A protein has these predicted regions:
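Juxtamembrane low-complexity tails/linkers enriched in Ser/Thr-Pro and polybasic
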Residues: 1-5
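Solvent-exposed, non-transmembrane regions of membrane-associated and secreted proteins
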Residues: 6-244
């Protein structure tokens, strides 16, 4: 065997090893994503069923159709109990990205335990019905990835929060990409884009996730304002469809 043929054989061997290694690691990554999403989906389903059962509601993700729905004045909302640490206390619906966010459990806290089972609520922020900023964080890649398609959201899209006694309907108004250090996004900021007057109550929802999708370098943030509140007996129209 000549020296040239030995080198060619060596290069082919190295090339095969590189290709094999790349295929192996790609498989590991894909498998990891699939497995994490699978177990996160199961955990979210379990949390949702337990929450609905505690509310004495039928389990599942189907909202019953009613011929009409009536709103209630925010002043008619009674005191809402503060969520228990690390527990699910509400469900989130976003019709625009309903394949990913539909009856998704909202947990108190934004640690891995909560985010791997649904969407997390920043403990220092307010809760639905309170004056302030109801701030949420969700994964965009792996572990259920509820906000994987945040780029599809548009101004005036509805974001709906279901609690034991009420449905809170928010309308998205503004989005921004920021650094992870921009903690002001969950604060009490009357951004001009929210179109709030000084007399309007400050009842805002904030959605936060990673940007770009496969990185934690930045955060994509959406803000919305509370538009309506419905008693739980009459779901908002955006959630229901007539029976065929």
């Amino acid at each position: 065997m000549t020296q040239r043929s030995r080198k060619a054989k060596l290069f082919r061997l190295i090339g095969s090893m590189c290709i094999g290694g790349a295929v192996f690691f790609a498989g590991v990554i894909i498998n990891r994503l699939w497995i994490s999403n699978y177990f996160s989906d199961r955990a979210a389903e379990k949390a949702r069923e337990e929450l609905l059962t505690s509310w004495n509601r039928p389990t599942g993700t189907t909202v019953p159709f009613l011929s009409s729905a009536s709103t209630i004045a925010p002043g008619e909302i009674g005191p809402i109990n503060a969520p228990t640490n690390q527990e699910a206390f509400a469900l989130l619906y976003i019709p625009r990205i309903g394949n990913e966010v539909w009856a998704t459990p909202i947990f108190e806290g934004v640690q891995s335990k909560q985010l791997n089972s649904g969407i997390g609520h920043y403990p220092q922020s307010q809760i639905p019905g309170e004056e302030g900023n109801f701030s949420l964080f969700g994964h965009r890649n792996s572990h259920g990835q509820p906000f994987i398609n945040i780029q599809d959201l548009q101004v005036d899209d509805e974001v709906i929060v279901e609690t034991k006694n009420f449905w809170f309907v928010y309308s998205l108004k503004h989005d921004k990409i920021v650094r992870p250090s921009a903690t002001w996004v969950t604060g009490l900021n009357r951004l001009p884009e929210l179109e709030l007057t000084e007399d309007d109550p400050f009842k805002v929802i904030t959605l936060v996730t990673c940007e770009p999708r496969h990185s934690t370098d930045k955060r994509w943030v959406w803000w919305g304002v509370l538009q309506a509140v419905y008693p739980h007996s009459t779901p908002p129209p955006a959630l229901v469809k007539p029976n065929n």
